[in-house]
Curated annotation (Swiss-Prot):
Keywords: Ribonucleoprotein, Ribosomal protein, RNA-binding, rRNA-binding, tRNA-binding. This is Small ribosomal subunit protein uS13. SUPFAM superfamilies: S13-like H2TH domain. Located at the top of the head of the 30S subunit, it contacts several helices of the 16S rRNA. In the 70S ribosome it contacts the 23S rRNA (bridge B1a) and protein L5 of the 50S subunit (bridge B1b), connecting the 2 subunits; these bridges are implicated in subunit movement. Contacts the tRNAs in the A and P-sites. PROSITE patterns: RIBOSOMAL_S13_1, RIBOSOMAL_S13_2. PANTHER family: 30S RIBOSOMAL PROTEIN S13/40S RIBOSOMAL PROTEIN S18, SMALL RIBOSOMAL SUBUNIT PROTEIN US13M.
Length: 121
């Protein structure tokens, strides 16, 4: 297994798909990285030469991925909560942030439904 940005990427998959195992790299970013590194998308990870691996590593190092990206996202959310914006308040209360309806659904964000005592008669 090749190791890129601290993540073991699978050997048997195509490079373009394997790079998506790194947090912050999706398919479009993966294609851009390979184009900049001059590596074919169809080649398998196990068939990469060490020069190609180094070129891919250099391109990935130029992008914010894994721990740095997670830290930045968390700091952005924390900043929204501190300034008291609408989005920050929604984050603090554990409700949907992007305007979704909460009358019936939003169970993923709100958690398991809690029964109200004394509802039955």
């Amino acid at each position: 297994m090749a190791r890129i940005a601290g993540v073991d990427i699978p050997n048997d998959k195509r490079v373009v798909v394997s790079l998506t195992y790194v947090y912050g790299i999706g398919l479009p970013t993966s294609k851009k990285i390979l184009a900049a590194a001059g590596v074919s998308e169809d080649i398998r990870v196990k068939d990469l030469t060490s020069d190609q691996e180094d070129a891919i590593r250099r391109e990935v190092d130029a992008i914010k991925v894994e721990g740095d990206l997670r830290r930045e996202v968390n700091l952005n959310i924390k900043r929204l909560m501190e300034i008291g914006s609408y989005r920050g308040i929604r984050h603090r209360r554990g409700l949907p942030v992007r305007g979704q309806n909460t009358k019936n659904n939003a169970r993923t964000r709100k958690g398991k439904a809690v029964a109200i005592a004394g509802k039955k008669k």
